[in-house]
């Protein structure tokens, strides 16, 4: 295949990837966006296989079959509630792939057209080093994020003295290693960059709490894009450079949007420690307060006699896998002539769009799902707000308590509703570690129990 034809096909793939991003920006066009992405990837793979430098189609075919089989197995078995962990795992694979490609280019540079072992060009060494650095950080950071999201590692921030100073010194040490590697081209220095970068990736994610996980997932998405971009430079592959830049830039923009939704800077998220000692002290102030409790029958009666209900899903809904029961409850209320809407906070859940994905899986109509800016003005005119596992994003302390770690974070104004029904397992705090003032409001009724079972019991009572 001629170089011109390769360039045209790669450009077509890049355009399809851009269309895919555009399509995925809205639920109604997301299916078409996925199709664009798949077609673009198929064109990219076939074009790459047409290169004269391909030595063994059998090995490549075997890798595609094995990888495709694993991917299909995961896609068929994965539950929608586990998508954040899956995304983090995929990011780790991109990171380690960048490291492997850089290692292959370093040990066999002739195959990549960048020189011979020990005499690689300076620009190629710099590209290789940066790709390795970003890839290793992405790998270890994503693995740790996976553990936090999966629950195998505590989601609480882990902080220690001089943490940020140590991270800064390690970063400077890596820069020094990169300079030494460019000068000496030593395998020992190369693997030192890999190991130290992996350590830095762990240290960067360790102090970040579960409440910040949506931003972390976005940041890791950005890192994986830049890692792929680095691979593109190493391989002199324009499509990888373009695609990596698209993913890196979109992830960075999404991180900014998510941080803005929490009224925090990306830097403050990276520094971590969200929900530390200050949050812990804040929980003790409400220990002597009482809450009003109710049950499924009470909730069914209140909602059945209301004109409007806003449902506010959060991470608790995801954990309980209550989205289908919740949708069934909403359908029954709509049949009774009640106006039902769903309110989504931008950082609800553990990844960007987490609640949107779960509601879409339960076939909740797109037009009923509204974002914070679209729905907040409706709460004062709403008779009932049904909150299901959305803790920090509904906490009025974000507006009233200047000492609170979440102060300044935009929240859903559910407290302005006439009645708030709050479904929760217990009075435990959210990931921020801050007690929710909403629990103690006169217009709030707590519905303690499993979110899915509570919704199912409400459905029975409504029927």
What are these language model-derived features?
Residues 285-463:
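Structured cytosolic domains appended to multi-pass membrane proteins
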Residues 16-29, 68-87, 142-157, 200-213, ...:
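C-terminal ends of transmembrane helices
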Residues 1-14, 51-69, 124-139, 185-196:
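Structural signature of hydrophobic alpha-helical transmembrane segments
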Residues 246-306:
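Membrane-interfacial segments at transmembrane helix termini in multi-pass membrane proteins
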Residues 48-61, 73-84, 99-117, 184:
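Transmembrane alpha-helix boundary signature
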Residues 31-40, 60-63, 82-94, 157-169, ...:
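Cytoplasmic-side transmembrane-helix entry/capping segments in multi-pass membrane proteins
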Residues 104-118, 183-188, 215, 222-243:
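Transmembrane helix-loop junctions at the membrane interface of multipass transporters and ion channels
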Residues 209, 223-267:
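Mobile "lid/hinge" segments at catalytic clefts and subdomain interfaces of large enzymes
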């Amino acid at each position: 295949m001629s170089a011109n034809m390769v360039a045209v096909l790669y450009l077509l793939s890049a355009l399809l990837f851009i269309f895919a991003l555009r399509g995925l920006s809205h639920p109604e066009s997301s299916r078409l966006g996925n199709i664009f992405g798949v077609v673009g990837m198929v064109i990219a793979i076939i074009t790459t296989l047409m290169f004269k430098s391909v030595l063994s189609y059998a090995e490549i075919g075997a890798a595609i079959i094995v990888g495709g089989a694993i991917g299909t197995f995961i896609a068929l078995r994965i539950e929608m509630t586990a998508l954040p962990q899956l995304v983090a795992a995929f990011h780790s694979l991109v990171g380690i792939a960048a490291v492997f490609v850089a290692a292959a280019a370093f040990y066999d540079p002739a195959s990549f057209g960048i020189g011979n072992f020990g005499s690689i060009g300076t620009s190629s060494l710099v590209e290789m080093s940066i790709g390795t650095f970003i890839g290793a950080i992405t790998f270890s950071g994503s693995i740790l994020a996976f553990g936090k999201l999966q629950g195998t590692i505590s989601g609480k921030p882990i902080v220690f003295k001089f943490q940020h100073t140590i991270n800064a010194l390690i970063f400077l040490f890596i820069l020094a290693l990169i300079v030494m590697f460019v000068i000496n081209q030593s395998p020992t220095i190369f693997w030192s960059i890999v190991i130290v970068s992996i350590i830095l990736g762990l240290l960067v994610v360790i102090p970040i709490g579960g409440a910040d996980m949506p931003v972390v997932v976005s940041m890791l998405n950005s890192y994986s894009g830049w890692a792929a971009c680095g691979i593109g430079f190493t391989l002199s592959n324009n499509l990888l450079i373009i695609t990596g830049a698209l993913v890196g830039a979109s992830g960075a923009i999404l991180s900014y949007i998510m941080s803005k939704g929490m009224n925090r800077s990306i830097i403050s998220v990276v520094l971590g420690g969200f929900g530390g000692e200050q949050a812990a002290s804040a929980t003790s102030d409400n220990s002597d307060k009482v809450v009003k409790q109710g049950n499924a029958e009470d909730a069914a009666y209140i909602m059945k006699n209301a004109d409007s209900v806003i449902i506010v899903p959060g991470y608790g809904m995801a954990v309980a896998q209550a989205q289908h029961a919740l949708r069934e409850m909403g359908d029954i209320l709509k049949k009774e002539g009640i106006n039902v809407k769903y309110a989504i906070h931008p950082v609800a859940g553990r990844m960007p769009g987490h609640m949107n994905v779960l509601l879409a899986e339960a076939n909740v109509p797109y037009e009923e799902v509204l974002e914070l800016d679209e729905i907040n003005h409706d709460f004062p005119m709403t008779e009932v707000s049904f909150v299901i596992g959305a803790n920090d994003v509904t906490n009025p302390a974000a507006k009233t308590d200047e000492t609170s770690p979440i102060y300044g974070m935009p929240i859903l104004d559910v407290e302005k509703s006439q009645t708030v029904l709050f479904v929760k397992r217990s009075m435990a705090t959210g990931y921020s570690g801050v007690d929710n003032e909403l629990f103690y409001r006169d217009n709030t009724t707590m519905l303690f129990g499993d979110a899915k079972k509570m919704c199912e019991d409400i459905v029975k009572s409504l029927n």
